[in-house]
Amino acid sequence: MKSWVFVLGLSLFSPEPIQSGPTERSFEMIEPRQLLNHVVRPTLAQLEIDGDTAEKLVMGTIAHESKLGTYLKQIQGPALGICQMEPPTHDDIWHNWLRYRPAMTEQLLKFVPMWAMEGKTEPDARLLITSLEYAVAMCRIHY
């Protein structure tokens, strides 16, 4: 059975191409199926906390919070990345949740480049902006 998710008026699982045209207020976004197939689904599978519900949750968050990747930093606020996670939330997950779950921490660190960990015990929240996979992984862990 095919699943359908409608986000910003777009069907994420539709076999038809999404048509876009000029609008009064246009913005650029990441094409939803590409984001799902090339970032969200593989990231969740590698974390081993995947599935249809998890995909919908993360894609819905991305659609709502950043308009499908239009914004990598909240315009008048601290939230970062395609899932718009605030740095204190990021840090709290590392300090109060991941530190007690070494297996999940090990999985998450696969999305963190080595340079981001030099001399640190956890990555800086700014990695949420530069790594789509890391942002998706942190979003899923947050839920």
Question: Which residues fall in each region the model found?
Answer:
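Sec-dependent N-terminal signal peptides
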Residues: W4-L12
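Peptidoglycan-targeting cell-wall enzymes and recognition modules
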Residues: T23-V39, L44, A63-Y143
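Catalytic phosphate/metal-binding cores of nucleic-acid and nucleotide-processing enzymes, i.e., regions
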Residues: Q46-D52, G60-A63
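Alpha-helix N-cap/helix-initiation sites
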Residues: D50-E55, I75
